[in-house]
Structure formats: C-alpha cells, structure tokens
Amino acid sequence: IDIAVTELDALANIDFESRQVKENFRRLNLVRLGTSGAIQQDIEVGEVVFSRTSLGFDGLLSYYEGRDAVCDLELERAFVEHTAWYDKLPAPYFVDADEELFDLFKDSVREGITIAAPGFYAPQGRWVRLRPHDMHLNEKIESFRFGERRITNFEMEGSALQGLARLMGHRAATICTIIAQRVAKDACTDYKPFVRRMIEMALDKLSTL
C-alpha cells in the first residue's frame, strides 16, 4: 500500500525532470473497494460497509513523521485498555476516512470502524495449527464500544491507505462488501454479484465529484 500511495502521489506532485515537489499541489481521491468479514451479529452478508475509521494492526503509520497528528489518540487509548493490548504487537492506530467522501456515500452504506489486519490467520483470530497469542482478542474487539461507536469488520489495507493519504493531504476511503459473517459463521461463496453492485454504486457516486 505505501508503494502504491507514494507512487500515485509522486505522479501527481513531483516534477520528474527536476526531482522537486511541484508548486501546485494536486489532491487525489483514493478509494479502496474490497471484501470483508463482519464481526457484529447484525451485519449481514451482502451489505456494504464504509470504514468511517480504520484501525491499523500493521504498525505502518508509526514509521512516518506526523502519525499522531492524523490519528484519534483518545480512541486508541480506550481500545488498548479494553483489549489489554499485548505490548509486543505493533501499536494500533485509528485514522478517519475523508469526510467529503463519507458524505458522498453515507446514504448507501453502513458505517463503522474497520480493522486492517496484517495477516489472514492469527491477526484476525483464525488458526489452523498455530494459535493466536490472545485467543479472546476477537471477543474483546466485538465488545468494544466508544460512545455509540463499535468495530464492525475486518479487512487488510484500509488503515495504511487512509493514514498515508491524510499525511500527504489526499482524500481516501475504504468501502467493502461483507462476504462473511464471522460471529454467525456464515459465508457467501457466490459473492461476485454483491461486489459488482458495490463497484457500480461507487463509480456512480465518484463520477459526481
């Protein structure tokens, strides 16, 4: 993700002949469309979730200057306390999607806090032979509340996209079709029609910008 975002930013804002930043900044709209698993009982397979806030388990943003300026530190502290976060894991970070993009989509989607996990198995509470360090982390995630806000789903890229975009001054958002209900242990194998519908909806919305 950092390669893709950095190269897109460079194409828009770097003069490749002089290797200098261009005088006139060009702001990009970066929207990830993907699939996701729900971790709240009331979210059904086939629904579309807009990641109003992305929760990064990957640690990527902490390598960049200005990380705290674009993250919700109060939400971070509450989550770390609630989960008794294992201190050998990267520090989790919460970064919001662009508000203008949210306003564009809010009438057609659910909103929530979405985890961006750095792996498919243990980081999302799954295992085959190698067990996660905290076997109860998903239960803590499911029960976490911050006012009326809650964590709704898992995916794997959104926090890096939204965090880097905010640091660079771009607009970004993550929108996912739910193809698995992790609590109810339900999954959709024929999810392409749901994804196609999401893509068509997103393109229609983005064409109005």
Feature map (PLM): residue ranges:
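Active-site rim beta-loop-alpha module in soluble metabolic enzymes
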Residues: 73-146
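Glycine-rich beta-alpha junction loops
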Residues: 37, 115-122, 160, 179-181
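His/Asp/Glu-rich mid-to-C-terminal helical/loop segments that flank catalytic regions of hydrolases
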Residues: 182-209
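Non-transmembrane, aqueous-exposed alpha-helical and coiled segments at domain scale
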Residues: 6, 15-28, 144-146, 150-151, ...
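Zn-dependent metallopeptidase/amidohydrolase metal-coordination segment
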Residues: 159-191
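Polyanion-binding loop/helix "lid" in catalytic or ligand-binding cores
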Residues: 89-96, 151-160
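Metabolite-binding pocket within alpha/beta catalytic cores that recognizes anionic/polar moieties
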Residues: 1-93
